[in-house]
């Protein structure tokens, strides 16, 4: 049985002032577990590729990369960048990762994803992968923004993710949780952080703002700004 590995970093808010936060950056652990595979012999499927952040990080190593995303604008940006870089082994396709049959994209040896995962994606990945091939991904953990009182429908708890992997036909070989928590001296610091990070506007429309205010008024002074699960699993 694979045990969960946990990493948590705590920051005082003052240490972050003036530094733009990047909540969609690539995990070094994710890159490591992907690059453990012989990528020069592999065709990769990058699910929810966006403008290609993960795909472009792997272009030197991979034999071929196919990125898929439902945002036509993001796919155009990715295609333009691949063309500018002369990368003829990288392809980007505009489609819905939860409805397309991955087998229609051709043989796939390794499925990867950065912060785009669902039970349906796991099922479709299992359908395209041969036994002993792998999926490796980062996904949101249920503790992401937990102080707001609202959990993303795309976020996983450890137990639910293990169940989804097992039911999808995967055997985990690496399971990790990476967290970053910011500590505030007072409520004003917390609200200032949300404004400077560009989060406030979205939270005011999706219900998180009111939940976070309630948390602050009750004396809470932390915010889990990053909570991701990092997974590598073998197709059974």
Named regions from a protein language model:
Residues 1-40:
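Conserved class I S-adenosyl-L-methionine
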Residues 48-50:
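Class I SAM-dependent methyltransferase "Motif I" SAM/SAH-binding loop
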Residues 53, 57-99:
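Class I SAM-dependent methyltransferase SAM/SAH-binding core
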Residues 102-110:
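A short acidic, Gly/Pro-enriched loop at the edge of an enzyme's catalytic core
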Residues 109-122:
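A short SAM/SAH-binding and catalytic strip from SAM-dependent methyltransferases
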Residues 121-134:
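A short glycine-rich, Lys/Arg-flanked "PGG" loop and its adjoining helix->strand segment in the class I
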Residues 135-154:
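Short, glycine-/aromatic-enriched active-site segment of Class I SAM-dependent methyltransferases
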Residues 176-236:
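Conserved Class I S-adenosyl-L-methionine
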């Amino acid at each position: 049985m694979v045990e969960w590995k946990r990493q948590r970093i705590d920051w005082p808010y003052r240490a972050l002032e003036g530094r733009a936060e990047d909540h969609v950056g690539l995990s070094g652990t994710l890159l490591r577990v992907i690059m453990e595979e012989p990528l020069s012999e592999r065709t990769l499927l990058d699910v929810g590729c966006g403008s290609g952040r993960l795909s472009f990080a792997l272009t030197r190593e991979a034999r071929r990369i196919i990125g898929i995303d439902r945002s036509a604008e993001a796919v155009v940006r990715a295609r333009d960048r691949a063309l500018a870089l002369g990368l003829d082994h990288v392809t980007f396709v505009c489609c819905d990762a939860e409805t397309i049959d991955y087998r229609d994209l051709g043989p796939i040896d390794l499925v990867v994803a950065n912060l785009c995962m669902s039970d349906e994606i796991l099922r479709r990945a299992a359908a395209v992968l041969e036994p002993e091939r792998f999926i490796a991904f980062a996904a949101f953990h249920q503790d992401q923004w937990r102080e707001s009182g609202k959990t993303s429908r795309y976020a996983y708890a450890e137990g639910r993710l293990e169940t989804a992997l097992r039911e999808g036909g995967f055997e985990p070989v690496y399971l990790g949780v990476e967290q970053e928590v910011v500590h505030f001296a007072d409520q004003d610091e917390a609200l200032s952080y949300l404004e400077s990070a560009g989060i406030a506007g979205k939270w005011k429309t999706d219900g998180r703002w009111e939940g976070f205010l309630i948390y602050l008024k009750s004396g809470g002074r932390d915010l889990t700004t990053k909570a991701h699960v990092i997974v590598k699993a073998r197709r059974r």
